[in-house]
Amino acid sequence: MINNAIAIIRDEHRSIASVLKGLLNHVAAVKAGKEEADLFLFKAMFDYIEAVPERIHHPKEDEYLFRFLRQRSSEAAAILDELEAQHVKGREDLAELRKILDDFDQSPNIHALDKALTAYAESQWDHMGKEDNVVIPLAEKYLTAEDWTAINTAFEVNRNHNAW
């Protein structure tokens, strides 16, 4: 069976990682005095992170992949608890980052932005690594064809980034 959901999850992870890397690269260039802070760019990239991971990607994982995996394997419970908690923490961290960025207009503090953004990016990269290297193999091991049909359907909805 072709598993489109896994390909989509990994593709979305690559996209999210690329945006985070772009943010960090711009912050590093600003800190080094090579570029001026581009608030439009920062805000557009933050909008992407709020739209894609927080409103599209994580809800699909929670509602479909994680839910079905919980039903099929107690082996996955601890990692799923951890990842779901990280989804909540990620939203909180992103709200804090947005506040730092909103304050940047009035009081530019590239060091505060760098510190918060670096911590956020590292936590997201670690999170995505656990999904790719722990959850997906468990899902491949335990989920049924019927589970994958439902998961694939859910992930295909946004395959062409229609909701972004």
Model-identified regions with their sequence ranges:
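Small-residue-biased structural context
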Residues: 1-164
